[in-house]
Swiss-Prot record:
It comes from the Bacteria. Keywords: Cell inner membrane, Cell membrane, Disulfide bond, Lipoprotein, Membrane, Palmitate, Signal, Sugar transport, Transport. GO terms for molecular function: trehalose transmembrane transporter activity. Part of the ABC transporter complex LpqY-SugA-SugB-SugC, which is highly specific for uptake of trehalose. Involved in the recycling of extracellular trehalose released from trehalose-containing molecules synthesized by M.thermoresistibile. Trehalose uptake is essential for virulence. The reported experimental results of this protein may help in designing antitubercular drugs and/or diagnostic tools. Disulfide bonds join 57-375. This is Trehalose-binding lipoprotein LpqY.
């Protein structure tokens, strides 16, 4: 998302927070009047956004039922655990769930999420598949059937110091060459990545693997495909070679084995990295910190026209004119581009993130829950979620909307990458598999591509078979 989005989101969410507190206050008594209340569980991080969208739907529903946002923890693992406990405990108050895109298979296989084909109105499948980007839609499927409908999505981009290079690198080989050139000149030479033992490392590996022509599992999620054919093995080894090369390159970040999204963002802002792969929030973060004087190569704090753009709580809250001024100034030293590819002249297949809406199998109000999902992700609410809330849209048509385009300077890249996206392996045991993969990949500086390829295949197979202890 761009800086103007974040600004609008902050202004808007301050108002929406009042609505959120109101919703929490009435939660205990909502059903006492006999009205139907559809619970809507979402991550706490975006509670204000999803509360405001729910209230818009309530205004449209005319009192037939009410959607009530309820917050899950901020961390994905804790969200999953809370939902799993509620579902295994047959919590009948659980209706609509915002699921991380990697949970679809697990929740479907466990019988926790209803297939969209069970919508009594018969509208859920058509709504999910119409005007929805193919990448996000793929994450909502298990065994060829839809169990959820996408509501938000995300994709990583390449961020780079435009004042240090003529053009952004198009491949990882070019990334390494550019970093080597900068190191030889004594300039910033880090490639900022997500290299510590966690899910972000699995995302990086999966993007490289799919971009090299490989994949972790077969499409049905039953067979490990990391080393099963010479072509697949070559793709796995190539992905591992890139990770190892980035970690051990001359002038590389000495703490690269402990890096995540936040350290990557700061490495570029603080002038130590010249190249970074990360999510779209990088741009608004850079502009805000530059206004505060924290970005040495972009001293926006020295521009008198930008005075007053930091509000009383210390966040970037510019006028539209101030935002345009800051954005245009940043273009002289900072840029964004497509995520670097593995093969020359072939675009990367970037692993996507986001949330899907699923109806819980424990719901007592199936028809209303499916109707709530349709309303929460309709085009107007997608516009609000994206432009005001700062969460990338899944509705294809919004990317052709001039208002949307004005708020997302990266919209073309985001759209193109979402159309040709990589998804993380679809399997009910994804959590165990991901944990094993990150443990095998770490520390990335010690990867032996051929040996690590075999170890990865073995660990993924053990996860599929449900054998052994998770590292």
């Amino acid at each position: 998302m761009d800086g103007r989005q974040v600004v609008r989101a902050r202004r808007w969410c301050a108002t929406a927070a009042v609505a959120l507190m109101t919703a929490s206050t009435v939660a205990a008594c909502g059903s006492d009047s006999g009205e139907i209340v559809i619970s809507y569980y979402t991550p706490a991080n975006e509670a204000a956004t999803f509360t405001a969208v729910a209230q818009r739907c309530n205004a449209e529903l005319g009192g037939r039922f009410r959607i009530e946002q309820r917050s899950l923890p901020r961390e994905a693992d804790a969200q999953r655990l809370q939902l799993a406990r509620r579902l295994t405990g047959n919590d009948r108050s659980l209706d609509v769930m915002a699921l991380d895109v990697v949970w679809t298979a697990e929740f479907a296989e466990a019988g926790w999420a209803l297939p969209l084909s069970e919508d009594p109105a018969g509208l859920a499948e058509a709504d999910a598949t119409t005007n929805t980007l193919p990448g996000p839609l793929e994450t909502a499927k298990w065994n060829g059937e839809l169990y959820a409908a996408p509501i938000t999505t995300n994709t990583q981009l390449l961020w780079y110091r435009a004042d240090l290079m003529d053009e952004p690198p198009a491949t990882w080989d070019e990334m390494l060459s550019e970093a080597a050139r900068l190191h030889a000149q004594g300039g910033p030479s880090w490639i900022a990545v997500q290299g510590k033992q966690y899910e972000g490392l699995v995302v990086w590996f999966n993007t490289l693997l799919e971009s090299a022509g490989g994949q972790v599992l077969s499409d049905d999620g039953q067979r490990v495909t990391l080393t099963d054919t010479p072509e697949h093995r070559a793709a796995t080894v190539k992905a591992l070679e890139i990770i190892k090369a980035v970690a051990t390159a001359p002038g590389a970040d000495p703490s690269i084995t402990q890096t995540d999204e936040n350290t990557a963002r700061l490495a570029l802002e603080q002038g130590r990295a010249a190249l970074e792969v990360n999510w779209p929030y990088v741009l608004p973060s850079l502009l805000e910190n530059a206004i505060k004087g924290g970005v040495g190569f972009l001293p926006l704090n020295e521009n008198p026209a930008l005075r007053g753009s930091i509000n009383d709580v210390g966040t970037f809250a510019p006028t539209d004119e101030q935002f345009d001024l800051a954005l245009n100034a940043s273009k002289e030293v900072f840029g964004f581009a497509r995520y670097p590819g593995v093969r020359p002249d072939e675009p990367a297949r970037v692993t996507l993130g986001g949330l899907n809406l699923a109806v819980a199998s424990t719901t007592r109000h199936k028809a209303e829950a499916f109707e709530a999902v349709r309303c929460l992700r309709n085009e107007e609410n997608q516009r609000l979620t994206s432009i005001e809330g700062g969460l990338p849209a899944v509705r294809t048509s919004l990317y052709d909307d001039p208002q949307f385009q004005a708020k997302y300077p990266q919209y073309e890249i985001i759209r193109d990458q979402l159309i040709n996206a990589a998804v993380r392996p679809a399997t009910p045991v994804y959590q165990a598999m991901s944990t094993r993969m990150s443990a095998t990949l770490a520390p990335i500086s010690q990867i032996d591509p051929e040996r690590t390829a075999d170890e990865l295949a073995e660990q993924v197979q053990q996860a599929i078979d449900g054998k052994g202890l998770i590292p």
